[in-house]
């Protein structure tokens, strides 16, 4: 677990506080069960930690924390704690405390001279590396339905782990037939950065000429293979496009 200190935090169903999602909804979450033992609300743990670091934090409850947030975030204008207690959920922006939030933004136009959106086209940049004779395929990575991100939580669920228990690389059946592969074969996936050995899965949803690997299995780390080259503007690594090759190998001992 690699932790020097473990705080007795509360679970989601034990918390009082707000959740703000990408749909611009500010929702008040209320506890439905009591916290067990020495468990405490997240804000209480953070306040106590801040005090021990020498900060003069004196919040008495979660509503004080929210009120300070609202004072610095224009998106929370007219959405105070008492309103959330009454309505449970409010969309921002809300232009008055007695008006509903704007569920559809820019419905009456955009803040431009014409009232229309300004759309700026962009020039697409080629990938850092393209397939060639040595690495003729494109490797892309992503998630599987059953495991979230690195699987730190979902792989501890026996139900989810039973559905996706082992790492696989997915390939279109036509590509596999050309190479003489069978379902479940052990294969080596190589890029210019490394090699991972795992089993093969046929998947017609994978485009011909491509391979797909999930990145949630530490025993077959997909990011040993991916390209760390950064996008020049967003500074995002090129995890979704790497030149790769695949070959059949013996089952590891």
What do these predicted regions represent?
Residues 1-3, 113, 132-135, 164-165, ...:
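Short, well-ordered loop/turn elements at secondary-structure boundaries
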Residues 1-31:
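Flexible glycine/proline-rich, aromatic-decorated loop/lid segments
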Residues 5, 136-138, 168, 210-211:
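Structural motif
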Residues 9, 30, 47, 112-114, ...:
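Pocket-edge structural micro-motifs
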Residues 62-159:
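Long, low-complexity segments enriched in small/aliphatic residues
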Residues 36-38, 42-87, 150, 156-170, ...:
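Long, contiguous, secondary-structure-rich segments that constitute the structural scaffold
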């Amino acid at each position: 677990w690699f932790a020097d200190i473990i705080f007795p935090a509360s679970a989601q169903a034990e918390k009082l506080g707000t959740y703000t999602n990408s749909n611009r909804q500010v929702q008040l979450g209320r506890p439905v069960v009591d916290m067990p033992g020495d468990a405490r609300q997240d804000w209480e743990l953070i306040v106590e930690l801040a005090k021990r670091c020498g900060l003069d934090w004196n919040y008495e409850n979660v509503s004080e924390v929210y009120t300070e947030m609202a004072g610095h975030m224009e998106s929370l204008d007219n959405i105070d704690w008492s309103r959330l207690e009454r309505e449970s959920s409010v969309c921002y922006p809300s232009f008055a405390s007695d008006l509903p939030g704007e569920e559809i933004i820019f419905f009456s136009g955009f803040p431009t001279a014409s009232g229309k959106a300004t759309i700026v086209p962009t020039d697409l940049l080629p990938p850092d590396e393209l397939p060639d004779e040595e690495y003729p395929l494109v490797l892309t990575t992503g998630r599987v339905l059953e495991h979230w991100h690195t699987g730190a939580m979902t792989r501890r669920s026996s139900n989810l782990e039973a559905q996706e228990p082992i790492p696989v690389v997915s390939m279109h059946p036509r590509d596999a037939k050309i190479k003489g592969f069978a379902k479940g074969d052990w294969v080596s996936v190589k890029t210019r950065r490394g090699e991972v050995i795992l089993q093969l899965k046929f998947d017609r949803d994978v485009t011909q000429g491509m391979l797909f690997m999930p990145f949630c299995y530490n025993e077959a780390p997909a990011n040993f293979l991916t390209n760390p080259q950064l996008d020049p503007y967003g500074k995002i690594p090129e995890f979704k496009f790497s030149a790769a090759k695949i070959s059949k190998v013996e089952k590891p001992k």
